[in-house]
């Protein structure tokens, strides 16, 4: 059985990237929460 994590920067960005987050209401909530917490990296 192959390993479950087969990294792809493009796939990762499409699901977890900044634009993906901003595309939905809940995604914007995630960014807002991370800003409030003072995270240096807001998204992938």
Swiss-Prot record:
Q: Which GO terms describe its cellular component?
A: ribonucleoprotein complex; ribosome
The protein's superkingdom reads Bacteria
Record bears the keyword Cell membrane: no
The record's keywords, sorted A to Z, are: Ribonucleoprotein, Ribosomal protein
Ribosomal protein is among the record's keywords: yes
Q: Name one GO molecular function term.
A: structural constituent of ribosome
**In this record, what's one Pfam family?**
Ribosomal_L34
**GO BP field:** translation
NCBIfam families for the chain? rpmH_bact (TIGR01030)
Q: Which family does it belong to?
A: Belongs to the bacterial ribosomal protein bL34 family.
Q: What is this protein called?
A: Large ribosomal subunit protein bL34
């Amino acid at each position: 059985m192959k390993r479950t994590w087969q990294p792809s920067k493009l796939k990762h960005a499409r699901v977890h990237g900044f634009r993906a987050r901003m595309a939905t209401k809940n995604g914007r909530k995630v960014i807002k929460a991370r800003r409030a917490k003072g995270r240096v990296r807001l998204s992938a």
